[in-house]
Amino acid sequence: MKRFCFALFLPAVLTCFSHRAAAQPASNSVAPPTATAPVPTSEEKNQAGYEKHTREVLNDLKLEDAARIAKVHDIMVAQFADWKAWHAKNDAQLKELWAEYGKARNTKNQTNIDNAMSPIDAVYATFKPQHDAFKAKLAAVLNPEQIETVENTLTAGQLPRTYNAYGEIFHGLTEGQKAFILKKLKTARAEAIDAGTKDEKAAFFKKYKDQIEAYLTAQGYDVKQSYKDFVAKQKAKKAATQPDVKPAAGDKE
């Protein structure tokens, strides 16, 4: 009788163990390798940069015509590629020349400044064919106001910002004086769009700011005092708009 009971019990035990074994993963199993994202090539990184900067231009233009958007896109991407290739060949030389220009500018001697700027202009003259072709391609798709939008985007809006600041700093500017300032700033912008860095773009604007301020001095403005008055006014305005902060409970006044 005992042997009969054991015979009945044994299949049930084996079935139980087989279920437990199936429920547990094998200790020797190997997990599948994790897929790694492919490392982008330098060309792919460059292309991503061209697309990013092109989107910035298109966002500011706010074009609605798909065909024009596509044309401006292709023009901008091609220009960024030409621009990067040119800077790869010339940036080492330009870095040294801009350093010399900075030293010359500190002397406040216009002859020294002009002499230091001359070789920089000579280097950038080699990019002029690409610059002119770029402007011609834009002119075939965009109106003059839209081209100015492109130029302002490429120079981080330095022209309108600087022009408006001059109006606040130097009171009573005549229409002729305003026209002179705007013309110089437009020349600065035209040169700065080819620059390789933010600092270099700013340097082109400084070049023409110096000329504007020399002009305003000749026009009877006290440039240094005008700047001091403007800074003092801005500080007073900021102080007036800041809320009074009361001491917290328990703090000593």
Task: Label each residue range with its predicted role.
Residues 1-4, 24:
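Positively charged n-region of N-terminal signal peptides that target proteins for export
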Residues 6-7, 28:
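Short amphipathic alpha-helical "recognition" segments used for binding
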Residues 7-16:
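Bacterial N-terminal signal peptides
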Residues 17-23:
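Sec/Tat signal peptide C-region and signal peptidase I cleavage site
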Residues 24-253:
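Charge-rich (acidic/polar
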